Swiss-Prot record:
It comes from Vibrio vulnificus (strain YJ016). One of its GO terms (molecular function) is structural constituent of ribosome. Signal peptide: none annotated. GO terms for biological process: translation. Keywords: Ribonucleoprotein, Ribosomal protein. This is Large ribosomal subunit protein bL27. Disulfide bonds: none annotated. It holds the Pfam family Ribosomal_L27. Residues 1-22 are annotated as: Disordered.
């Protein structure tokens, strides 16, 4: 009699859903107030002029304008700001 014993269950086979992080609006792009510019974990990018910081560190536009990325300060931090059009 050809029989096969039941295989043991595997301990793998789990993975978390991707969080879709990253830059959503790039430098020079026009944005409206409220548009999300960057979704991030921690402050990889810091909020500059006319940019708000959400509780999950999301950067969003406070006014309409163009997105500008810049590196400033002694620690070479990356800032995102909005310039009025």
């Amino acid at each position: 009699m050809a029989h096969k014993k039941a295989g043991g269950s595997t301990r793998n086979g789990r993975d978390s859903e991707s969080k879709r992080l990253g830059v959503k609006r790039f430098g020079g792009e026009s944005v409206l107030a409220g548009n999300i510019i960057v979704r991030q974990r921690g402050t990889q990018f810091h909020a500059g002029n006319n940019v708000g910081l959400g509780k999950d560190h999301t950067l969003f536009a406070l006014t309409d304008g163009k997105v500008k990325f810049e590196v400033k300060g002694p620690k070479n931090r990356k800032f995102v700001s909005i310039e009025a059009e």
